[in-house]
A protein has these predicted regions:
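Nucleotide-activated donor-dependent transferases that construct or modify glycoconjugates
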Residues: 2-17
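Generic cytosolic/nucleocytoplasmic N-terminal low-complexity/intrinsically disordered segments
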Residues: 1-2, 102
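Extended catalytic core of nucleotide-activated donor transferases of GT-like folds
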Residues: 9-10, 22-30, 34-105
Length: 105
């Protein structure tokens, strides 16, 4: 079974589950129904958590480091980026360097 990390704005903390029928959830559910193992990675919620309640440069830096460590632990086959503007290109290049066979979509 292929592992996919879905990086998107899931609004889990801020809106308290208000948008659980949004597009990120629909994309994840569609991938699960097609036989993939999907790990949802809420980038904006984690940035707020790492930035002490605000989306600031401290949260962004820690978020990018956390994504690299998260990929090292989970060893995904693909990363699906959905409106994740907080993830830097350098982070994606570093993940691609660590896992050359990884697909970034």
């Amino acid at each position: 079974m292929k592992k996919i990390i879905h990086v998107s704005n899931f609004n889990l903390i801020r809106l308290k589950g208000c948008f659980q029928v949004g597009f990120p959830f629909k994309i994840s559910n569609g991938l699960i129904r097609n036989g993939y193992s999907v790990l949802n990675y809420p980038d904006r919620d984690l940035c707020r958590m790492f930035g002490f309640g605000h989306m600031n440069f401290i949260g962004r830096n820690r978020l990018n480091k956390h994504l690299i460590n998260f990929c090292k632990v989970t060893e995904p086959d693909a990363i699906l980026i959905g409106h994740a503007d907080l993830i830097s290109n350098e982070t994606l290049f570093e993940i691609k360097r660590l896992f050359p066979a990884l697909k970034i979509m």
